[in-house]
């Protein structure tokens, strides 16, 4: 008997209040890294009706106009009208940054005898994941959820659906049979809108112009449940509807619940923070394992102690899909990937102003030129070392 189950993931648009906060935090990080790539940054943002608060710890030689960066980011997202509850020109921006604690800095900045022996900026555990459900090696529900809100933003920006507003959420439920995606069961999309659009017209346009063009044709089987703005009116949104905070969408940022999460958010953190850099490295490792054909699913866990460079643990789980044992793959990971914090920074070239782009529509599964952790350049070496035939993605 086939093992049949449903699995759901969600995403949110760039205009969701928590994502507004994430993007401001990462825009500030990028501006700092452009001037001083060795800065220590932990930039937190709160945004509410007409108000943005910037706080956290920053140690840098850069000279940054934080208020202007916050306003520019809000404008780019699309909050350019007082009717939206926050607009880039009229909102108040409060700045309350401190410097990084010297107690933390002493462990992060020590070089020891090895120039790659920088200690981790904190203790913690991080996960990376990849699977063969999509060409991007991502779980299908989160991949489709991202594409839906990305399309919502595209149609809003180019004016095809002029009544769309920046805030939106999506949710996709996929039916799996024997562990593989079989069909789309339910799609939820809630979008902020202008007050004068009638609900029936909105629902028809969202289904025909946003949802249907996004769904893979081979997974449309039978009747799909489309739930568009199921509560009806959604005029008040963005930071006016809910207070936004950096780091509150960590499952949206990663794998949509298909893999565990260590709990540490990404946005606003420079790459000395392993919450971010080691999660990126975990994705890089997992993606190369799957791309090499060593497994069809791979979960990586790494953990760190503050001030210590070497990971305290490295774990690989292929859920029984491995062509060699998990112990062999773990050994290969240790041989082919430098998972010390400074080794990760060097391996993935992370001291670049590349982070604002990550702060909406997922940090993983996007073929962006800056996203070095999405490369599969280690896959062939892994396949050869394991003695297996590489997949078509590598050959």
Swiss-Prot record:
Binding sites annotated in the UniProt record for L-methionine: 57, 100, 242, 273
Localization, UniProt: Cytoplasm
Record keywords, A-Z: ATP-binding, Cytoplasm, Magnesium, Metal-binding, Nucleotide-binding, One-carbon metabolism, Potassium, Transferase
Record-level Gene Ontology MF annotations: ATP binding; magnesium ion binding; methionine adenosyltransferase activity
Residues that hold Mg(2+) according to the record: 18
E.C. number(s) listed in UniProt: 2.5.1.6
Cofactor-binding details, from the entry: Binds 2 divalent ions per subunit.
GO biological process, one term: S-adenosylmethionine biosynthetic process
Binding-site residues for ATP, renumbered to this chain: 16, 167-169, 233-234, 242, 248-249, 265, 269
Enzyme class: transferase
Residue ranges, annotated region (Flexible loop): 100-110
Record field: catalytic activity: L-methionine + ATP + H2O = S-adenosyl-L-methionine + phosphate + diphosphate
Pathway recorded for this protein: Amino-acid biosynthesis; S-adenosyl-L-methionine biosynthesis; S-adenosyl-L-methionine from L-methionine: step 1/1
Entry keyword annotation includes Transmembrane helix: no
CC cofactor: Mg(2+); K(+)
GO cellular component: cytoplasm
Binding residues for K(+): 44
Subunit structure comment from the entry: Homotetramer; dimer of dimers.
Role, per record: Catalyzes the formation of S-adenosylmethionine (AdoMet) from methionine and ATP. The overall synthetic reaction is composed of two sequential steps, AdoMet formation and the subsequent tripolyphosphate hydrolysis which occurs prior to release of AdoMet from the enzyme.
NCBIfam families assigned to the protein according to its UniProt record, in alphabetical order: metK
PANTHER family attached to this UniProt entry: S-ADENOSYLMETHIONINE SYNTHETASE
Similarity remark: Belongs to the AdoMet synthase family.
Cited HAMAP family: S_AdoMet_synth1
Protein name (Swiss-Prot/TrEMBL): S-adenosylmethionine synthase
Biological source species: Burkholderia cenocepacia (strain ATCC BAA-245 / DSM 16553 / LMG 16656 / NCTC 13227 / J2315 / CF5610)
